Amino acid sequence: MAESLRLLHMTRSVVSFNRCLTEKISYRRVPSFSYFTDFLNQVNSVSTTNFSFVFKECAKQGALELGKQAHAHMIISGFRPTTFVLNCLLQVYTNSRDFVSASMVFDKMPLRDVVSWNKMINGYSKSNDMFKANSFFNMMPVRDVVSWNSMLSGYLQNGESLKSIEVFVDMGREGIEFDGRTFAIILKVCSFLEDTSLGMQIHGIVVRVGCDTDVVAASALLDMYAKGKRFVESLRVFQGIPEKNSVSWSAIIAGCVQNNLLSLALKFFKEMQKVNAGVSQSIYASVLRSCAALSELRLGGQLHAHALKSDFAADGIVRTATLDMYAKCDNMQDAQILFDNSENLNRQSYNAMITGYSQEEHGFKALLLFHRLMSSGLGFDEISLSGVFRACALVKGLSEGLQIYGLAIKSSLSLDVCVANAAIDMYGKCQALAEAFRVFDEMRRRDAVSWNAIIAAHEQNGKGYETLFLFVSMLRSRIEPDEFTFGSILKACTGGSLGYGMEIHSSIVKSGMASNSSVGCSLIDMYSKCGMIEEAEKIHSRFFQRANVSGTMEELEKMHNKRLQEMCVSWNSIISGYVMKEQSEDAQMLFTRMMEMGITPDKFTYATVLDTCANLASAGLGKQIHAQVIKKELQSDVYICSTLVDMYSKCGDLHDSRLMFEKSLRRDFVTWNAMICGYAHHGKGEEAIQLFERMILENIKPNHVTFISILRACAHMGLIDKGLEYFYMMKRDYGLDPQLPHYSNMVDILGKSGKVKRALELIREMPFEADDVIWRTLLGVCTIHRNNVEVAEEATAALLRLDPQDSSAYTLLSNVYADAGMWEKVSDLRRNMRGFKLKKEPGCSWVELKDELHVFLVGDKAHPRWEEIYEELGLIYSEMKPFDDSSFVRGVEVEEEDQWCYC
């Protein structure tokens, strides 16, 4: 009785020990050897069960040191291990790649069975040493199916697929009976070789030997068909599996994802949950990828919660898929929380975050994460580089991009097509076109994305003809253009190349891509910007006519939302087209129609309509749009804010304009330019200069537009020295070559300060021909400062060479002659104007009262209250006449005088 109780106690202790040891090793808390020896001393016994269990756990968890200590204790204790125990010990050494120790154990084994040989073959196969594996295989006295499977798997893992096929053929010749694992391996070979026909032959063998109901073989079959883009066969195999397990469910869900049948993947996942098949690591990863691609944040979040409960959340593959899901569902906040709370982060986790922040246009955060990745010692790969190049493009970080491309060259990853494509895109967006073309030129292999990247780079940098040339080169290289190609090439045609655009439209129709939503929007944009609004509206109406669609309510809702987004882009293009044609009223009417149709405007719509309000000085409508912007919480957008600043200033409301400027959370050079331009336009030169100086202090780099505004402010104030300082600052401090508008402002500054001849010299020193604006500016200042008749005549002659029908040139010169008392020349000019049938451009004024726009032209009697208006103007003119020296209208015919004064 006492002996029985002792044995029972010892058995319970062994079970307890085994359980504790499993927990410690599985949680990476590898116990010290004393834990093992203390137990043996307590039970005062060593057995096959103890050592085999320890060796199995050490092999499973890679605890090599504990395995070695247990091996030493086994020798010291004098325990004579069985073949089974020694096979378990072999597994410890082969799993940890310690083949010296493994060979010693194998050589000293008194009795080897087929399992012993298989352990050595499998170990060498996994270590990419197929020579040694083959040597052991050939020396085996007896081989079983496991031995052959190890060789099959080894050759596959080492990329020697043809060798795997040879082994499979030899198995058949030797009469070895195939099992499910054999078929699983050889079908993986078919997938690797992309040889679906061979896979179908293997399928025939599977059916013939009766393995078609084997879940392992069937799962491999459906995986092979899915990867070979024959999903119908894959689905048929799945439906034929009598008892589906987590492996088969995982294979079919992964197949759906591989074939972009993402909704079906989610459907299978829900069905799997109903039958309680159990969720594996690969299922979590596949379904999370589907959620990411479909922006299914709600389901993705639920799956993450499920993973947390089942302890799968700590798995590296599942964690990376979860991070990627949150990032692609625009939820970087939860992605960052998961990232920060994760232990043992791997490179894939960093890649998911870098890519996510790059896609969310948080370039600086992505760059910081890449720096952390570099510091972590995990290294980088092609995905890391592609993501960080996008980040460099976002922040216009050319210097960072150059350094990172240096890393790509050093690591030979610059040869990767995806990395090269990302680098081309980055250089293009950073305006380093030469570098972009160099990377493109050095590529050994180019795909459609490579051509799209270099074409887009040239289009973004205003190289329209080069873009068209590259498009032709792409076609000659037999690369089929896609929606991204046509998007870039049609943008290149918006600069006036309508003929090319129409030819490309024909190519689009022939290629069958006219129904593509992205291409349709690009066509609408191209025709709108080329001034062919009617053609753009035709395409818009034809493209977005209602179509009969079917699907679930959820799918229909998504399709509807996507279509509304596409329609918004299309409407934006047409509205922008009207603005470019200076038809702001039509643009506003189109915006009203858009709202009536229930299409939600985006920030680009609001910005464009605010531009029309600025053009028409429609402060009322502008304020209504501003209210909508606040309601949709878009006021923090830098683009919207800049447009609001510009709109209020052009409507004469400098107070609200400055208020919007100061409230702006982020100001770029456009915001600063809008405010400075507003002050300059309203003659507030001092405020404009103060704001410009503040802009410099805040390290905002001014551009050409900034200097146009600040020079205009100097012209208003007559600040010749300050104007010259800013003019020379452009090239000296910022590398900006002055353009025609800058010279025009300098002519105005010099002329208004009385230095008319110096202004003429500046025009002659210009590196390019003066335009009509500059000559008209010079002629205008001649009317202010007398005794500059010769300069005025030269300016008039230049203006008439540019446009012989320019009536303003005659009018201004007439005023110069009148101021100089040269009445005969005034009369001659008036006769010439009548002889050439030239008429003064009628003056035009407008005012907005109670949301209604009133427009007035000289001599206009179309307004319903024109009689009251003319009566009031007559009273004002009669009060002005006694104080007017009439020098302005000398030389004008008497019957025209009153009409001129009503302008």
From Swiss-Prot:
Name used for this protein in its record: Pentatricopeptide repeat-containing protein At3g02330, mitochondrial
Keywords linked to the UniProt accession: Mitochondrion, mRNA processing, Repeat, Transit peptide
Chain intervals for the UniProt region annotation (Type E motif): 774-850
A GO cellular component annotation in the UniProt record: mitochondrion
Transit peptide segment: 1-31
Organism, as annotated: Arabidopsis thaliana (Mouse-ear cress)
One annotated GO molecular function: RNA binding
Main location as per UniProt: mitochondrion
Subcellular localization(s) per the UniProt record: Mitochondrion
Protein role: Involved in C-to-U editing of mitochondrial RNA. Required for RNA editing at 8 sites in 6 different mRNAs in mitochondria.
Assembly information from the UniProt record: Interacts with MORF1/RIP8.
GO biological process: cytidine to uridine editing; mitochondrial mRNA modification; mRNA processing
Residue ranges, annotated region (Type E(+) motif): 851-881
Consequence of gene disruption: Retarded growth, reduced size of leaves and length of petioles.
Top-level taxon in the UniProt lineage: Eukaryota
